[in-house]
Structures are given as C-alpha cells and as structure tokens.
UniProtKB/Swiss-Prot annotation:
Lineage: Bacteria, Pseudomonadati, Pseudomonadota, Gammaproteobacteria, Enterobacterales
UniProt name for this protein: Ornithine carbamoyltransferase subunit F
GO BP, sorted A to Z: arginine biosynthetic process via ornithine; citrulline biosynthetic process; DNA damage response; L-arginine biosynthetic process
Pathway(s) annotated for this protein in UniProt: Amino-acid biosynthesis; L-arginine biosynthesis; L-arginine from L-ornithine and carbamoyl phosphate: step 1/3
Enzyme class: transferase
Domain of life: Bacteria
Annotated L-ornithine binding sites: 168, 232, 236-237
Annotated carbamoyl phosphate binding sites: 56-59, 83, 107, 134-137, 274-275, 320
Protein keywords: Amino-acid biosynthesis, Arginine biosynthesis, Cytoplasm, Metal-binding, Transferase, Zinc
Assembly information from the UniProt record: In E.coli strain K12, trimer of identical or non-identical chains are composed of ArgI (I) and/or ArgF (F). The trimer has the following composition: FFI, FFF, FII, III. E.coli strains B and W, which are known to contain only ArgI, produce only a trimer of identical chains (III).
Chief localisation class: cytoplasm
Gene Ontology molecular functions: amino acid binding; metal ion binding; ornithine carbamoyltransferase activity
Gene name of this polypeptide: argF
Protein source organism: Escherichia coli (strain K12)
Chain's role: Reversibly catalyzes the transfer of the carbamoyl group from carbamoyl phosphate (CP) to the N(epsilon) atom of ornithine (ORN) to produce L-citrulline, which is a substrate for argininosuccinate synthetase, the enzyme involved in the final step in arginine biosynthesis.
Amino acid sequence: MSDLYKKHFLKLLDFTPAQFTSLLTLAAQLKADKKNGKEVQKLTGKNIALIFEKDSTRTRCSFEVAAFDQGARVTYLGPSGSQIGHKESIKDTARVLGRMYDGIQYRGHGQEVVETLAQYAGVPVWNGLTNEFHPTQLLADLMTMQEHLPGKAFNEMTLVYAGDARNNMGNSMLEAAALTGLDLRLLAPKACWPEESLVAECSALAEKHGGKITLTEDVAAGVKGADFIYTDVWVSMGEAKEKWAERIALLRGYQVNAQMMALTDNPNVKFLHCLPAFHDDQTTLGKQMAKEFDLHGGMEVTDEVFESAASIVFDQAENRMHTIKAVMMATLGE
C-alpha cells in the first residue's frame, strides 16, 4: 500500500484500478480481523478532523468507529462548528488544520472545497461527499457486491442505477465502472442523465477493462439480466421543497418495486441503496411526502422491496466503516 501513503481520496478516477482493488482487499481483511478479534491498531496517536457542512449518520459513524478501532482520535466539526468559508477561507482553514491533524475528512458542498483543502492542508484529505462525487460510498458498494457474488469479477457483473443519475452517486458510479469494467446501466429520464463529457471519459475507460456503460429510459431493457438494482432518494440534501412535486412526477416511473425486480429475470437479483431511504412513512419527512404525493408504499423504493430478502442495504451500511478504515489505513499508515 506504499503508493497510497499520504494520497488524497477525492474522487475515484484519481486512482488506478490496482489501487482501487487494493483498497477493497484491505477492507475485506480489516472486516475479517475485526470480526475475529484480531485487529491490530496502526493509527495510534493519529489525530483526524471531520468537517461536516452536511449532517450524516453513516459517514460520521463510519469515520469515528474506524478511527477509534485503529487507535486514532477524532474532532468533529459540524455545520456550525467551524468558520470554514464564513469567517475564514478554505485555504486558510486547510493550512491551520494541516498543522494540527494527520488527516482531514470533508463532507459538504462543492468539489472545489475538498480540492482546495487537499491543495493546502499538507496531509491526506478524504471526500466524505460533495455535490459532485461520493467516492467512499462506491467503495463500500463494490465491496458489498463482491461479498454477494464471490468469485465473480466486476466485469462479469451488471449494476443498474434507477432514478436521478445526474447527482454525486451517478457520477461516482460512472467512475467506479471506469476502474472496474462493470456493466453499468443508468436507468433514468434524459433530463436526469449525467454530463456527456464524464460519460464519454468513463465509457472509454470501462471498455478497456471489459465493461460498458449504458444510459437508457427503457425500464424493461435497462434491468434485464441485472445482478444489482440500486437507487437513491429523489430529493437531494438541501433541495427546496418546491422541487419535490416536479422531481416525483419525473421519476415516479423509475421506482424500484417488485415489478422492476421481476423484470430482471434474475431470481437472485439484489437491491442496493446508500440510505437513508423513503421506503415507508415512519419518519417525519416520509409522512409528509406520503400525504402530499400519495406515496404510502414508498418513494424511490417500495417497502416490500426494501424489507425483502433481496435487500442488502445494511451490508452496504456496515461496509462503509470497513472501507473508510481501509482508506485511512492506506493513506496514514506508515
């Protein structure tokens, strides 16, 4: 892992396929060691700053537990816990934190923020989520896919992403396919397709590794033969409620439900979601949406699919911690 030491983790295309694979291998080993009580602490004495301009359950807990398991200490800086971008520039914040911490995680808005932190901090910077990319999520996703199709190469797997494909998840899936050769199908209305330049770049790379990237509006053709169907919330973090009706009308036909799962003709197809999910009305926001838009059976995914044996979403959630631990170990462990 020496070639990853001190390296930033900002987006997946910053890595070679071999480096990406090495992170997955390390994550699997760390997961096994933790479960077998054999984990060895290699980050003892390290200090890690966690900058969250957007709140999160999984990302924060994953970084904190991973750090604690490895003997590191963390400082959580929440949405109101720092002056970044308000009273102090990102450049200055980077140079201050870089003098105090061994690594910095950023979860927030524009990709340019995490890129600036990386440019000036002088220590490894990790992207916990930006508007453009969500690389740690895809690392966990592919680890989960490996676990459920053991012995199968990524270029033998078919992953369908149904919904709004122009967001950070769609972009990072394109990059993951570019590195691994997945058969990636983005199933979405054309208004929700990613930028053509990124699609072209990732398609060319995916083909080199035995894969392909397809964009389609056709549900039946898009899901046929799929090994995994993935979706995400239709309303992104921080979006105005006024956009809800427009987005729901646009994406209602791409809901992951029993019919879509059956159209794969694969009885072993699995369901993926990065969470949180609007699959029922058991949350305040879920109740509001169910009432306003008649979505009592779920929004982007039905409760039937979410709670089915095909759903492996909590394996994904757990693997966030193991893969994030691998990233910190590889970039901080000497």
